Amino acid sequence: MRPPVSVLLQLFQTMASRLPFPLCPPLRAARNELCRGLHLAFRLAATHRRTVVLEPCMEATEGRISVRLPKGVHWGRPVDVPLPPSLADSGWRGGRPRPITVTPQRRAAANVWFLHHGREALCLRLELSGTVELLRYRPLSGAWTRC
């Protein structure tokens, strides 16, 4: 007797979520850009004892760091990608990413940034305490995993 298709599909999704699929090169470059930008913002804020702002798509000026994305990577969450479980009941709806403000005390304005390339997506979640959570959406398994 053959197992039902839904059981096979669920088994396939479970196995696929455990495989170490690498990020596509444009999203890998974007992830590195985000991590470098955040690290630099925290470092500059602590060193100069003043607030630093990390902004998407803006020109860098004094006290402001600009984040540029590689070609093909776009801001926002695609419609067919669900919110991560940690944001499901947060009331977050999306839209353009707002600037992240980092203070010298290693605190930050809580914020969420989504970016995507095709069907793959990244979610950068920054808490008030300054802790960073970076998640990726894996379309094959339909789930968010730590990046």
Tell me the role of every PLM-derived stretch.
Residues 2-147:
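N-terminal helix-rich module
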